[in-house]
Amino acid sequence: VGGYHICPRDQHGLTGPCAPSHDKGKDKMRKFLTGITTAAMLMGSAAYAETTLKLVEVITSPERTKVLQGIVDGYEAANPDVTVEIISLPWGQAFEKLATMVAGGDIPDVVEMPDTWQALYAGSGQLASLTDHVADWEHGATLTEKTVAMGSQAGDLYMIPYGFYLRAMFYNKNLLAEAGVEPPETMADFMAASAAVSELEGKSGYCLRGGPGGTNGWVMMAAAMNGTNDFFTDDGKSRMNEPGSVEGIQFMLDLYQKGYAPKDAVSWGFNEIVAGFYSGTCAFLDQDPDALIAISERMPAEDFAVIPMPVGPSGKAFPTIGFAGWSIFKATAHEDKAFDLVAALSAPEANGTWAKRVGVIPVHKGADQDPYFQTEQFEGWFKELNGEQYEPTTMPTYLEKWGYFASTVVLETSQEALLGQRSAQDLADEWAEFLTDEHAKWQAKQ
């Protein structure tokens, strides 16, 4: 027909194979049709994997990347039309590298967002609101209230936190039993228990962090005794030298100067306080869940437990909290698919896996019912997350010189005070003056 022959049908009525034709026109047409078919198949395949999402992780380690890749692999298997490209930035350079990417237009769809960066990116309008997405998400209602509060800025949700680094109190059961005291619930109990343990030969009550990274301890004690974790008054003045805060600073000085902490603790950092606890040198240690890794390797589980931070005269405690989570950049061309990825990363099962492997407290209601978390070692953190008398404290990292204050000013001046060279009031006044000035500079830029 028209220069082309029709092949005979087989017994099923289908066109059967034809003998090769020596007609050049037919060969050209066959090649043409084959080319069209191949192109169509390739186009169809491309359309099937049509979306690539760029995910940037910033708190990078081999273990974290391995866990993240495993969750992403499961997401890709369930969503064959989406490919996820993971970009791992080393933590020490992550802030600058992400800022450079964003400024250059190489903006990721999904980003691991530390708490200290959230105000910067959300405040400048660069993050997509997740409020409506979470409202429609099957697991949205199981996020704890503190999780939603921590991921929000100005009433909008810009991050789904994946876990918390929350400060709570480790205690050595054997030392408390030997000293004849119960786990402390109040600041007064804590001082009395520390004194009792310190009566034991070669033992101290508290693993005080007088060296690098000790700012959290001073802030928590000051807040507990002052009854508030607000850093500033409405008119911008630091609360650090209010009478209650001065009492909290004096509380820390008393622990050391009365001999309820080891003498060497004036220079102890993270490794030293953790070692001081698992070696049985001191009975109390305030730390985050990631300290469990080293402690659990060296102490039997039945020898220690974790309780909430002791409450002050107001009946409240203000444990410091750190967290990170998943955010979506507003510039993404695939917001719905990006949220599907965030939802997969944040689902209860995935979040539970992440929390166990990374060393954070999970974010969903009922997570404490997982047998892994139903231990005395995790009890204190879940009580803090679920109890109204515990208000997590976030540092004012929006202040330009907060890093300098925490790492240098507090370190140097508090060591002088611990050694008896300065008073609590003197310390509080210097800190308050510094913070009030920094707050004024920040306020002027708003």
Regions found by a protein language model. Name each.
Residues 50-62, 82-87, 109-110, 158, ...:
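Short, well-ordered beta-strand elements
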Residues 52, 83, 177, 391-446:
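Conserved C-terminal helix/tail region of periplasmic/extracytoplasmic solute-binding proteins
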Residues 53-70, 89, 165, 213-214, ...:
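Extracytoplasmic "Venus flytrap"
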Residues 70, 74-143, 152, 174, ...:
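Extracytoplasmic "Venus flytrap"/periplasmic binding protein-like
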Residues 115-168, 182, 191, 199, ...:
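Hinge/lid segment of periplasmic solute-binding proteins
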Residues 119, 288-301, 312-412, 440-446:
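C-terminal lobe and pocket-closing loops
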Residues 128-143, 210-213, 227-247, 296-299, ...:
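Short, solvent-exposed loop/beta-turn-alpha elements that line the ligand-binding surface or hinge
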Residues 194-196, 237-265:
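Glycine-centered hinge/linker elements that transmit conformational signals in sensory
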